């Protein structure tokens, strides 16, 4: 898969492409990452890439001419590429979107700066706008790296161990379980005995319960519309009975009953 990043700061990307899983994917020929400087497509002595917005207001807007030329130049080489703009109005990026893009065509990523891009570019040359969250960044470069990293991890061969991607958070709409490594006891805190038992069936059950618990506590929205396995349904039903018992105890003895009985 080829990524072409259109940016005013191309020197940000060699470091991204030169480390970890991304570097390995590049070296194996699984992906190629090219950063094009939008300024190289600007005209005039100063190669101006931004201007004041019509109608007034704060900030500057990326000019349409250099951005259009940059996109078209990238499309000449990667004719079937999908043009993705990293911007705040876009669809919220998630694992499902990463998987969809990983199974698709090459991607041209447009990194916004200032107040954004001219709407005429968005309306005619952008295939999809993506946001990585409800917060403000200085530009689309870091967002582009987030999106590329998530996509590259899903390309076959990038991780080395294909099961790694399947077991990570969000891959099955659950947050990942807790992890422990040596030593078994650290500053008085012990590793759960079951993880040291060697019983892989019980370990899998423990991990399933932990994933469900973390998801229910921190991201219950991920569970909406999810198809649960029989094992997961049993776990949730058991929790439901335990919660009902707690509620009955409080109803009989008052809200302080639990603290008094400890």
Curated annotation (Swiss-Prot):
S-adenosyl-L-methionine binds at residues 112, 132-137. The keyword Methyltransferase applies. SUPFAM superfamilies: alpha/beta knot (SSF75217). GO terms for molecular function: tRNA (guanine(37)-N1)-methyltransferase activity. GO terms for biological process: tRNA N1-guanine methylation. Specifically methylates guanosine-37 in various tRNAs. This is tRNA (guanine-N(1)-)-methyltransferase.
């Amino acid at each position: 898969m080829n990524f072409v990043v259109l940016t005013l700061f191309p020197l940000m990307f060699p470091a991204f492409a030169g480390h970890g899983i991304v570097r390995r994917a590049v070296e194996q020929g699984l992906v190629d990452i090219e950063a094009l400087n939008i300024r190289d497509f600007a005209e005039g002595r100063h190669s101006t890439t931004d201007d004041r917005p019509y109608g007034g207001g704060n900030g500057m807007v990326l000019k349409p001419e250099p951005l259009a030329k940059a996109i078209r130049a990238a499309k000449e080489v990667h004719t079937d590429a999908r043009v993705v703009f990293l911007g705040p109005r876009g669809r919220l990026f998630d694992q499902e979107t990463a998987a969809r893009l990983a199974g698709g065509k090459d991607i041209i990523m447009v990194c916004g700066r200032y107040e954004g891009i001219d709407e005429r570019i968005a309306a005619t040359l952008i295939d999809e706008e993506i946001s990585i969250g409800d917060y403000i960044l200085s530009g689309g470069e870091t967002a582009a790296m987030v999106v590329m990293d998530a996509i590259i991890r899903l390309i076959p061969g990038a991780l080395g161990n294909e099961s790694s991607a399947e077991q990570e958070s969000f891959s099955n709409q659950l947050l990942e379980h807790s992890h422990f490594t040596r030593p078994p006891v650290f500053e008085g805190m012990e590793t759960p005995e079951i993880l040291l038992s060697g019983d892989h069936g019980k370990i899998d059950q423990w991990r399933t319960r932990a994933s469900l618990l973390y998801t229910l506590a921190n991201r219950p929205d991920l569970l909406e519309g999810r198809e649960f396995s029989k094992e997961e349904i049993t776990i949730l039903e058991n929790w439901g009975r335990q919660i009902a018992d707690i509620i009955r105890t409080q109803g009989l003895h008052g809200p302080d009953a639990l603290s008094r009985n400890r």
